[in-house]
UniProtKB/Swiss-Prot annotation:
PANTHER family: UPF0114 PROTEIN YQHA (PTHR38596:SF1). Keywords: Cell membrane, Membrane, Transmembrane, Transmembrane helix. It is a multi-pass membrane protein. This is UPF0114 protein PC1_0431. It comes from Pectobacterium carotovorum subsp. carotovorum (strain PC1). Belongs to the UPF0114 family. Signal peptide: none annotated. It is found in: Cell membrane. The chain crosses the membrane at residues 15-35, 53-73, 136-156. InterPro entries: UPF0114, UPF0114_bac.
Length: 168
């Protein structure tokens, strides 16, 4: 009975495969919105104010960072929790594949969230005169919470790696 339960639990990791595949649909939706924004701004490029263009570009950068985050979570999550990716050497292989454990993935995700939050905060500050002070304060507090969380996660990861190397 114990062996059956263990095998069932181990096999159940494959339930994550369609979830990771579903993230690729999210990536497709993000790409569609990205190009929708590009096609929306291009016809008006000579009429748009510089500040508005910067806001659009920040939005595009934001979407690009989210897309990179999706790819990172999809591929490394699949590889860490479902199965190793069997990519032939002749194809373009991302150099970080197979090297990112769940701790590294968490740190990369946290760093990406901080970068995305930074871009969003910059976009908010570009329009600060139209946003109430208390709302600006909350944007900054939330961003600093992301930064602090990323720093603490990085510190804890470093400490656990240090403890592992010390024990070895």
């Amino acid at each position: 009975m114990e062996r059956f339960i263990e095998n069932l639990m181990y096999t159940s990791r494959w339930l994550l495969a369609p979830v990771y595949l579903g993230l690729s649909l999210g990536l497709l939706a993000l790409a569609i919105k990205f190009f929708q924004e590009v096609f929306h701004v291009l016809p008006n490029i000579f009429d748009i104010a510089e500040a508005d263009l910067v806001l659009v570009l920040l939005s595009l950068i934001d979407m690009t960072l989210v897309g990179g985050l999706l790819v990172m979570v999809m591929l490394s999550g699949y590889e860490n929790f479902v199965s190793a990716l069997d990519i032939t050497d002749g194809r373009e292989k991302l150099n970080w594949l197979g090297k990112m454990d769940s701790g590294s993935l968490k740190n990369k995700v946290a760093a990406s969230i901080v970068a995305i939050s930074s871009i969003h905060l910059l976009r908010v500050f570009m329009d600060a005169r139209n946003i109430p002070d208390n709302k600006l304060m909350w944007y900054v507090i939330i961003h600093l919470t992301f930064v602090l969380s990323a720093l603490v996660m990085g510190y804890l990861d470093r400490m656990s790696r240090y403890e592992k190397s010390k024990a070895a």
